[in-house]
């Protein structure tokens, strides 16, 4: 965790503890823009020690506790407005992106479809369905006008959906019937895409004309709803608000021009209070004028498209009046123009509703801000400015060899289109009067130094700038460090890239940048097979084993049991059984045969079976062998 994250988390926790929570964006911006008077830099521009970190934490908490101060109100307005603007732009880009992706998929299905030839009926039928799906999606896009999330109130009605499909199918059949798709098949991919776009405009134009004559166009936003809706008077509201803010700015400008020795005297605290109030008004006016510029462009677009739409409707009524058909060379371009004007009007309505939300956000911020400059001081300043004796005549001491280019209306073509740096405020008053924003006078000349076009409020300021221009260029940066609300107002983001409000707001709290999304690598690991509580002992994951079992089961179903069963009829399955070995019938001991016989005789005598030895079971029969008989010599 770096020092910024550590301090921001601590500040957010402490603010919640003190019962005045702040957003992470505000806490981070204030933390990064705390001025260190010892180094004339921001604290976080240098590596901080532990004591400096504690000092910075205390300073941030003290500044956030003064949330009602004019300078903090200005920072709050900058963050709130830029966050809302970026969020609306992200939503609009996401919507356009999703529509483009879906349209691309449907277009690819049509373009990539391969058909044998122009007489392939089945292939042409499939192609016709895919073209119909493309047109149906393009027509359903027009059901959303920005006032709701689901389209018109009857968009979910099945009957309405059916009627939309019916109208789209009829429009497709009238422009290019199914049997006439042969020439479309022979086109190359780019030509097919062009034809699809033109076909979409034609079908939409036909449905728009049918809606105008009240014979169809179900689901389409009525033409009057594109011209009359809440927020259509935004341009008048903005002009009225801008007029009031400009009047207040002029009063503050006259007051500060007459503050000084011999004129109006105020304390330093009052000077800072009124100066910060003027800064808030300048920033508020900048946002108001930015919205007004966008609304003016939008109004011009609405007027031109409204004129085109009504003109094409009138021409189509003339061509198709009391006629069932007309030459396609005359009506097709008008249907296409009608669709294009309608789509642009629909898009302008969505943008206008977004600008209304931004304008209401600014008005809410303005209502919570109170101006404290007394009316009597304003009147005193106006009286002093009307006294001609207070005007000093000073000549501008300019020479061409000073390295500064002077642009005047008489010697510069397109002088009024010259871009002014620092938003056209007097450079001298910013540097010498603690960031005071007084308007410069381009009529005195635009002074270009190091690609910076600077203007000043009087001749005396110009002469001081000409004597040391680098001091003023660097002085603006120093004043932005002391007054961080000027960084965004004076377009000084390039000089403070680490505290660029646009990039910082878009990258915080799950946001994204407008140009490119913030991409990160992220991975997660999960087990291939989760261990289940219930285990199946017969579970088998091997597909080959399952296939083998399936074949065996299918083979068994076709078998029949015979009366005589052999090994061959038993499906060649080896059957084995395990039993105990048979017991031994004989016992081997250490006794001899004579001992056994003697034991048997003794047992027989005990039982009275044998009375004497002559009746023993094994009596001894003596035998005598005589030799030498039959005249044989034994010697």
UniProtKB/Swiss-Prot annotation:
Chief location of this protein within or outside the cell: cytoplasm
Similarity comment: Belongs to the CFAP206 family.
One Pfam family of this chain: FAP206
GO biological process: axoneme assembly; cell motility; cilium movement; regulation of cilium beat frequency
GO CC annotation, single: ciliary basal body
The keyword Cytoplasm is assigned to this record: yes
Keyword Protease part of the UniProt annotation: no
PANTHER family per UniProt: CILIA- AND FLAGELLA-ASSOCIATED PROTEIN 206
InterPro entries, per the entry: FAP206
Subcellular location(s) of the protein: Cytoplasm, Cytoskeleton, Cilium axoneme
Protein name as it appears in the record: Cilia- and flagella-associated protein 206
Function: May regulate cilium motility through its role in the assembly of the axonemal RS2 radial spoke.
Coiled coil location: none
Keywords recorded for this protein, A-Z: Cell projection, Cilium, Cilium biogenesis/degradation, Cytoplasm, Cytoskeleton
Deletion consequences: The mobility of cells lacking CFAP206 is decreased. If their number is normal, cilia are slightly longer and display uncoordinated motility with abnormal waveform characterized by decreased bend amplitude and decreased metachronal coordination. Cilia axonemes display a classical 9+2 organization of microtubules but their shape is abnormal.
């Amino acid at each position: 965790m770096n020092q910024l994250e550590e301090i921001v988390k601590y500040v957010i926790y402490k603010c919640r503890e003190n019962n005045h929570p702040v957003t992470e964006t505000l806490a981070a911006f204030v933390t990064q823009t705390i001025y260190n008077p010892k180094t004339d830099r921001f604290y976080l521009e240098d590596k901080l020690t532990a004591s400096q970190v504690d000092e910075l934490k205390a300073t941030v908490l003290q500044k956030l506790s003064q949330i009602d101060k004019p300078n903090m109100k200005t920072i709050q307005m900058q963050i709130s407005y830029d966050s809302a603007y970026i969020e609306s732009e992200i939503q609009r880009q996401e919507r356009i992106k999703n529509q483009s992706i879906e349209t691309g998929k449907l277009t690819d299905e049509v373009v990539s479809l391969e058909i044998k030839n122009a007489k392939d009926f089945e292939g042409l039928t499939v192609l016709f369905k895919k073209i119909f799906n493309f047109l149906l999606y393009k027509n359903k896009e027009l059901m959303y006008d920005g006032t709701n999330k689901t389209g018109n109130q009857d968009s979910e009605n099945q009957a309405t959906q059916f009627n939309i499909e019916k109208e789209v199918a009829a429009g497709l059949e009238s422009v290019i019937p199914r049997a006439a798709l042969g020439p479309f098949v022979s086109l190359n991919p780019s030509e097919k895409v062009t034809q699809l776009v033109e076909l979409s405009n034609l079908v939409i134009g036909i449905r728009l004309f049918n809606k105008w004559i009240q014979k169809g166009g179900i689901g389409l936003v009525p033409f009057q709803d594109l011209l009359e809706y809440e927020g259509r008077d935004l341009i008048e509201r903005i002009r009225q608000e801008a007029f009031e803010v400009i009047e207040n700015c002029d009063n503050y400008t006259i007051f500060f021009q007459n503050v000084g020795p011999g004129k109006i005297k105020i304390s330093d605290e009052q000077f800072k209070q009124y100066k910060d109030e003027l800064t808030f008004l300048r920033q508020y006016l900048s946002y108001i004028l930015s919205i007004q510029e966008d609304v003016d462009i939008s109004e011009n677009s609405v007027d031109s498209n409204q004129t085109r739409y009504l003109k094409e409707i009138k021409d189509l009524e003339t061509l198709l009046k009391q006629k069932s058909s007309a030459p396609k060379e005359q009506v097709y371009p008008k249907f296409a123009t009608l669709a294009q004007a309608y789509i642009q009007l629909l898009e302008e309505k969505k943008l206008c509703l977004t600008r209304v939300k931004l304008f209401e956000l600014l008005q809410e911020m303005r209502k919570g801000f109170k101006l404290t400059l007394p009316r009597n001081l304003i009147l005193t300043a106006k009286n002093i400015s009307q006294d001609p004796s207070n005007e000093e005549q000073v000549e501008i001491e300019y020479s061409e060899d000073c390295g500064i280019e002077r642009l005047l209306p008489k010697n510069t073509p397109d002088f009024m289109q010259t871009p002014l740096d620092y938003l056209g405020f007097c450079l001298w008053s910013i540097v010498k009067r603690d960031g005071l924003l007084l308007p410069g006078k381009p009529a005195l000349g635009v002074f270009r130094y190091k690609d910076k076009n600077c203007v000043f409020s009087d001749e005396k300021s110009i002469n001081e700038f000409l004597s040391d221009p680098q001091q003023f260029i660097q002085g603006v940066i120093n004043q932005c460090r002391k007054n961080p609300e000027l960084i965004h107002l004076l377009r000084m983001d390039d000089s403070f890239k680490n505290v660029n409000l646009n990039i910082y707001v878009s990258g915080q709290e799950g946001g994204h940048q407008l140009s490119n999304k913030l991409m990160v690598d992220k991975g997660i690991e999960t087990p291939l097979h989760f261990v289940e509580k219930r285990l199946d002992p017969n579970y088998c994951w091997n597909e080959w084993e399952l296939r083998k079992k399936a074949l065996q089961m299918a083979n068994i179903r076709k078998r029949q049991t015979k009366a005589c069963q052999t090994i061959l009829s038993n499906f060649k399955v080896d059957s084995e059984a395990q039993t105990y070995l048979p017991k031994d019938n004989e016992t081997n001991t250490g006794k001899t045969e004579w001992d056994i016989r003697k034991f048997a005789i003794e047992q027989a005598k005990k039982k009275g079976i044998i009375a004497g030895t002559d009746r023993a079971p094994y009596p001894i029969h003596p035998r005598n062998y005589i030799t030498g008989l039959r005249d044989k010599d034994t010697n």
